[in-house]
Regions:
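Transmembrane beta-strand segments of Gram-negative outer membrane beta-barrel proteins
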Residues: 32-59, 67, 87, 206
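Residue-level signature of outer-membrane beta-barrel architecture
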Residues: 33-35, 75-79, 148-151, 200-202, ...
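Repeated loop/turn-to-beta-strand initiation elements of outer-membrane beta-barrel proteins
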Residues: 35, 81-85, 153-156, 205-208, ...
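Transmembrane beta-strands of outer-membrane beta-barrel pores
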Residues: 43-49, 91-95, 151-153, 160-164, ...
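Residues that define the transmembrane beta-barrel architecture of outer-membrane proteins
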Residues: 63-69, 138-143, 150-152, 190-194, ...
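Outer membrane beta-barrel
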Residues: 76-207, 213, 400
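Detector for outer-membrane/organellar transmembrane beta-barrel domains
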Residues: 268-367
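Outer-membrane beta-barrel "beta-signal"
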Residues: 383, 388-390, 395, 415-432
Length: 432
């Protein structure tokens, strides 16, 4: 029943695209005056250090250096009282020793997230790779391209867009559409997906969001219900500082239900999400809960959090060799889809933010894989350098024995390891 509904909806959205694409790109709209034009340019530099037995060291260098330049141009306009158009164009260029090393190992793109950007599974192909060889990669794409209609009580949007759900601080089991990695430092924009989005705004202050994301089978290019997503989330404000979320979805051919909450308690906020997925092998439950608190110390604004994450697909015995990973298809599929970023089953994390000055923030985070007792520490300094300029700088420091997630998991060849490298990074951003 749900699968056939997704198929019919995917077919409908394809016909709707043919009708709305000329509306977005036709000259009266695409070249109308009074567009709100803005942009940003970012340069990201990272320098990593690996042990001699790491696969990166064997393929390229023990100290790979990666450069990444990204340009985003944004155009937004409201036309009439109800309609609006959003267009974001991005162009990126990478020169990265890490990419060159990843090409030599078939397991690395899945585990490390490497690979050329593409829209093979999306409804529209809005990405073009200019060059992809050696350590270099250049590509450009439309990351947002949508038309919206708003009325009292509801908002509709069609096209490439992004939604964020979930109540986790760094782990997001309820955010099933392109969530950020727990160690991502720049969370300004999520990758967009081609979708139909409807939000019903109720008089009570509650709302119902519905999302349809049709996807293609990569091999055939055909729209497939078992590759698509249809989800609905109801947000309910109970009063007295409590919010609840109820999620129901059909996602990649599997039924999913979730519950989330956020409660004010003694000046702190307690949050949590619980997600249950029905698969062919049975049910899988993932969840996250956290508490965060803000205070003032010696004239400085501060905030801190503690979080526990249960990865229902994770490996509990700390055995991450190639055979164990291959046998856990559910985990590896979600890692390849960039829905999950961790291998273990149980994690605790904590973090603190200090406002050194109104323009200078220090962030420290610590993640522990409870199943293998490996750790990852991250320090980030965020400096509002001057008007329209920001600087991010920091380090990632893993701790753990060989064979652990953050100490470096065993590669396909005995005695070689993947991951576990220390890194420093710098990002300079200019807004215009």
């Amino acid at each position: 029943m749900i699968s056939s509904s997704v198929s019919r909806a995917a077919s409908l959205i394809g016909r709707l695209a043919c009708l709305l694409a000329p509306l977005i790109l036709s000259s009266p709209l695409a070249w109308a005056e009074n567009w709100n034009i803005s942009g940003q340019a970012k340069y990201f530099l990272s320098h990593s250090r690996y042990d001699a037995d790491n696969v990166f060291a064997a393929a390229a260098s023990r100290s790979p250096i990666d450069h990444h330049l990204n340009l985003r141009l944004s155009a937004n306009q409201r036309w009439g009282n109800r309609w609006d158009t959003v267009i974001h164009y991005t162009a990126s260029a990478l020169s990265a020793d890490s990419i060159e090393a990843a090409r030599s190992f078939s397991a690395l793109p899945t585990l490390a997230g490497y690979g050329s950007p593409n829209d093979d599974a999306r409804l529209f192909n809005l990405t073009s790779v200019v060059s992809d060889q050696g350590k270099n990669l250049q590509a450009h794409r439309f990351d947002r391209l949508s038309v919206g209609y708003s009325e009292t009580g509801y908002v509709f949007r069609f096209g490439r867009h992004a939604v964020s759900w979930g109540n986790g601080m760094i782990f997001q089991p309820m955010d099933i559409f392109n969530p950020f990695s727990p160690t991502t430092i720049d969370k300004e924009y999520k990758p967009g997906d081609d979708m139909a989005y409807l939000q019903n705004l109720l008089a009570s202050g509650n709302d119902l969001q519905s999302v349809l994301i049709p996807r293609r089978d990569i091999a055939s290019g055909d729209l497939r219900a078992d590759e698509s997503s249809l989800a609905m989330k109801y947000h309910h404000y109970t009063g007295g500082g409590a919010d609840m979320d109820f999620l129901a979805a059909r996602h990649y051919g599997e039924n999913l239900a979730g519950f989330g909450f956020a409660i004010d308690w003694q000046g702190a906020v307690i949050r949590g999400d619980l997600v249950n997925v029905w698969t062919a092998a049975g049910t899988t439950v993932s969840g996250v809960t956290s508490i965060n608190y803000s205070w003032v110390w010696d004239g400085h604004n501060m905030s801190g959090y503690g979080e526990y994450f249960r990865n229902g697909y994770g490996i509990s015995d700390g055995n991450y060799n190639a055979l164990a990973l291959t046998a856990n298809a559910a985990l590896m599929n979600r890692i390849s889809r960039r829905e999950i970023f961790t291998l273990g089953k149980d994690y605790v994390a904590g973090g603190i933010t200090i406002e050194v000055t109104p323009r200078w923030l220090l962030n420290a985070a610590l993640i522990n894989n409870m199943n293998d007792n490996s750790w990852l520490a991250q320090w980030v300094a965020n400096f509002d350098w001057q008007e329209n300029w920001t600087v991010l700088a920091g380090t990632n420091l893993p701790f753990g024995a060989k064979g652990t997630e953050y100490g470096g998991i065993e590669g396909a060849t005995s005695g070689e390891y993947i991951g576990g490298g220390k890194s420093m990074f710098l990002q300079i951003a200019h807004y215009f």
